[in-house]
C-alpha cells in the first residue's frame, strides 16, 4: 500500500507532496510507510476509505454545513421552555460586548500581576450580587448551579459540625446526583417529601426528620416545579431550632420581585447565574454563585 500525500489541502499544513518528502528526508525516511512501520500490520487499513470528495474552498464547506444546520429547529426561531438549569432569556448586547473585552476574555489563566481587568470585573460582579442578595460575602462564580449548591451544603455542614443533610424530594434529579457526588461519603443526603397539592416541601415530614445529626436544610425558591416555598420562614426557623444551617437556592432574576432569602432566615444562598446574561450553549456555559454573611 502506498500512503499518498495531498496535492494541496487548504486545512492540512505541509500537505504538498514536495514538502512532505522534504520533512521525511529530514528525519531519514523515504516514505510514510517507514514512519508507521511499528504499527502492527493487521490494524492498518489497506483499502481506500469511502469518503466524499473534499470541498475545494472554505466557502463551499460553509454553505454545506449551514445547509445541514438548517434541518435543526433553532431557539433563534422558536421559544424554549424546557428550563431545568438552562433558560432562554434575552441577553442584552452590552453583555456580549463586555464579555468579549480583551482585559476580561483571555486564554491565559491569569496571575495577580497581569489580570487586573478580570479582578476588577469580578469585584464589580461580587459587589452587585451582594447588593441584589442583601448578603455580605459573594464568591467568584462556580462552574454551575449544581456545584454552587453542593459547595454551599458542604459549607453549612462544616459550620454546624454535623453530617446530615435534608433536601427537597422535588429537586432536579441531575442536581441531586451532583450534590450526592460532592457530599458522599462524608455527608448523608436525605430527601424531604413533596406536598402533592402545593408542590412545596412537606413541613410535617421535614420536622419529623430533623434531629441532632442534621447540619443543613436545603430548599429552593422557586423550586423545580416553579412553586415558591410560601413557608420559607417556617422551614428556616425549624432548621435553626434543630441547630442546622439553612441553605437556599434561588433564581437571581426573581429577586427583583420576591423577598431575598436572608429576610426569611437563610444562612447561605446559592443559585444560577445563567439567567443573568449567559447564552444557552448545548447545555453548557453555565455558572453559579454562593453568598453568605
Language-model region placement:
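Charged, compositionally biased N-terminal leader segments and the immediate start
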Residues: 1-16, 23
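Conserved PLP-enzyme active-site core in the AAT-like
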Residues: 11-12, 147-293
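PLP-dependent enzyme catalytic core of the Aspartate aminotransferase-like
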Residues: 22-25, 127
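TRNA-binding/sensing appendages of the translation machinery
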Residues: 29-43, 266-271
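N-terminal entrance/gating region of PLP-dependent enzymes' catalytic architecture
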Residues: 37-124, 130
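Short loop-beta-helix segment that forms the pyridoxal 5′-phosphate
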Residues: 112-114, 131-151
